[in-house]
Amino acid sequence: MKSRNGPLRVGIGGPVGSGKTALTEKLCKAMRDDYSVAVVTNDIYTTEDAEALVRMQALPSDRIVGVETGGCPHTAIREDATINLQAIAGLNERIPDLDVVFIESGGDNLAATFSPDLADITIYVISVCQGEEIPRKGGPGITRSDLLVINKKDLAPYVGADLEVMDRDATRMRASRPFVFSDMKRGDGVSSIVNFLREQGGL
């Protein structure tokens, strides 16, 4: 499925604790039998997320690369994506038949975006636990990502979040751009995200 332009590069961003690594794990497990998949994770001072994905057996360890960004994690996905582009180039060299590379950003704020030179498709993950007002706060991740994932919907009753309000606000803020509610712990919403990637990414 490798295109002439190389593998489909999917950027996964969102605040700390929103569920980016859980989403990356679920997507890898859902797609690895049909596609050649790899992951690049971004952490400021460690490769903890990459190590977590290896422990979760999301993919073989040679398909998971962790980069230490230092400083502000958004710089490595936006202003200067060199470290990530180099990691992808290394994966391409080792695994020439790659179809999809997931690029998981370090936890960041609502203003974080991926450089178009780095990601073909962007997914932004927020958590119900961050408050029902998060969708209406806006920011590029909320309004301009190709897909918004509102995760941990199962916890809404425990944190006083109204999913109907979040649905309404997300619809208003994103206009025609899609979003999905998910519960990564149970895998709820994963199939919708995979279908989105297949359709939008031409897989």
UniProtKB/Swiss-Prot annotation:
GO terms for cellular component: cytoplasm. GO terms for molecular function: GTP binding; GTPase activity; nickel cation binding. The keyword Ligase does not apply. Keywords: Chaperone, Cytoplasm, GTP-binding, Nickel insertion, Nucleotide-binding. One of its GO terms (biological process) is urea catabolic process. The keyword Protease does not apply. Disulfide bonds: none annotated. InterPro entries: CobW/HypB/UreG_nucleotide-bd, P-loop_NTPase, UreG. GTP binds at G14, P15, V16, G17, S18, G19, K20, T21. It is found in: Cytoplasm. Its main location: cytoplasm. NCBIfam families: ureG (TIGR00101). HAMAP family: UreG. Facilitates the functional incorporation of the urease nickel metallocenter. This process requires GTP hydrolysis, probably effectuated by UreG. Homodimer. UreD, UreF and UreG form a complex that acts as a GTP-hydrolysis-dependent molecular chaperone, activating the urease apoprotein by helping to assemble the nickel containing metallocenter of UreC. The UreE protein probably delivers the nickel. Belongs to the SIMIBI class G3E GTPase family. UreG subfamily. This is Urease accessory protein UreG. It comes from Rhizobium etli (strain ATCC 51251 / DSM 11541 / JCM 21823 / NBRC 15573 / CFN 42).
